[in-house]
C-alpha cells in the first residue's frame, strides 16, 4: 500500500526544494514553498494523518481558502534536509470551514509549524486563485542570488526592472509578459508584507522583495520553479553585462512587440512603453 511520502505532491515538494537548494537559492532555512491541493489528492492517505491534528489560528480569516488543503514547508526547516526527512520538514495542512485557522494533518513532527511566511503565501494564493480562475496552485519564495543583486543597482521600479529582465534573455517576455512587481523593503514574516505581496500578485506572477528574494506563482511546481529560474537566468546575464561596462545594444521595443505577437502574449504596457 502506498504511503503519503510516495504521493506525487510529497515527491514534487522534495524535488523542488532539493533543486532550489542546489541552485543556491535557499541557504540554511531560507525560502518557503506551498502547493494547493484538492481533497481527492489527500483522501487516499488518511491512514497516515495524525490521530489528533494540531490546530493553529490564522492571524486574519481567509474564507476563500475554507476547506482547502496545502502541502507546505516548515518554519526554520532547511530545504537541503527535505529529501532526507520529508515528514519532519513538510506538512499537509487543511484550512477549516470558516477560514479562521488550519489543522496540521500530516508531517511537521516534533511540534514544528508551517513557514513564517504563511500569511504572505495564503494571501497570495487568494489573489492568484482570482487572477487565474483557480489555475495557479503554487507559491514559491526563495533567495535567488542575481535577482537580489539587481535590486541594489537598478531603480526599484516595476516597469524598469521588468524591461531589463526582458532584455536580459529573449524568452523572458514570453514566460512572464505580465512583468515583475517589486515592493519597498519590508520586515519579513508579517501580515503587512503578505498584504503588499498579494496586492502585486493581482497583476504579476513574480514579485521581488528588494535585498531579500522573490515570490513566484504558477499552476504546477515545475511552472513556478521554471518562472523563477528564467528570471534568475536573465538577472545573471544582466549582472555580467553590467560588470563588463553595460549594454552596447539590446532587444528593442519593436523587437519585443514582434516577440509578443509571435507567441500570443500581451506584454506589460508600462514596461514596453518605457523607451524605444
UniProtKB/Swiss-Prot annotation:
Binding site for Zn(2+): 141, 143, 212
The keyword Cytoplasm is assigned to this record: yes
Keyword list, A-Z: Cytoplasm, Lyase, Metal-binding, Rhamnose metabolism, Zinc
Domain of life (superkingdom): Bacteria
GO cellular component: cytosol
GO MF annotation: an example: metal ion binding
GO annotation terms (biological process): pentose catabolic process; rhamnose catabolic process
Disulfide links within the chain: none
Quaternary structure, from the entry: Homotetramer.
Name assigned to this protein: Rhamnulose-1-phosphate aldolase
Amino acid at each position: 500500500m502506498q504511503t503519503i511520502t510516495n504521493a506525487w505532491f510529497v515527491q514534487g515538494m522534495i524535488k523542488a526544494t532539493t533543486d532550489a537548494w542546489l541552485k543556491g537559492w535557499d541557504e540554511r532555512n531560507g525560502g518557503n514553498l506551498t502547493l494547493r491541493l484538492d481533497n481527492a489528492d489527500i483522501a487516499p492517505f488518511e491512514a497516515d494523518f495524525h490521530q489528533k491534528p494540531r490546530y493553529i489560528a490564522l492571524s486574519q480569516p481567509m474564507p476563500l481558502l475554507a476547506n482547502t488543503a496545502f502541502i507546505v514547508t516548515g518554519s526554520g526547516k532547511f530545504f537541503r534536509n527535505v529529501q532526507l526527512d520529508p515528514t519532519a520538514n513538510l506538512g499537509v495542512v487543511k484550512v477549516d470551514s470558516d477560514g479562521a485557522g488550519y489543522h496540521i494533518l500530516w508531517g511537521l513532527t516534533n511540534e514544528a509549524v508551517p513557514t513564517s511566511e504563511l500569511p504572505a503565501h495564503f494571501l497570495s494564493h487568494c489573489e492568484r486563485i482570482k487572477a487565474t480562475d483557480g489555475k495557479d496552485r503554487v507559491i514559491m519564495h526563495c533567495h535567488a542570488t542575481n535577482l537580489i543583486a539587481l535590486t541594489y543597482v537598478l531603480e526599484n521600479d516595476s516597469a524598469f526592472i521588468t524591461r531589463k529582465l526582458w532584455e536580459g534573455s529573449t524568452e523572458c517576455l514570453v514566460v512572464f509578459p505580465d512583468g515583475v512587481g517589486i515592493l519597498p523593503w519590508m520586515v519579513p514574516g508579517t501580515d503587512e508584507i503578505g498584504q503588499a505581496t498579494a496586492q502585486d500578485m493581482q497583476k504579476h506572477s513574480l514579485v521581488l522583495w528588494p535585498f531579500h528574494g522573490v515570490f513566484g506563482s504558477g499552476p504546477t511546481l515545475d511552472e513556478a520553479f521554471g518562472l523563477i529560474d528564467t528570471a534568475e537566468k536573465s538577472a545573471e546575464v544582466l549582472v555580467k553585462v553590467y560588470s563588463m561596462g553595460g549594454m552596447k545594444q539590446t532587444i528593442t521595443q519593436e523587437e519585443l512587440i514582434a516577440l509578443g505577437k509571435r507567441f500570443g502574449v500581451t506584454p506589460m504596457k508600462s514596461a514596453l512603453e518605457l523607451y524605444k
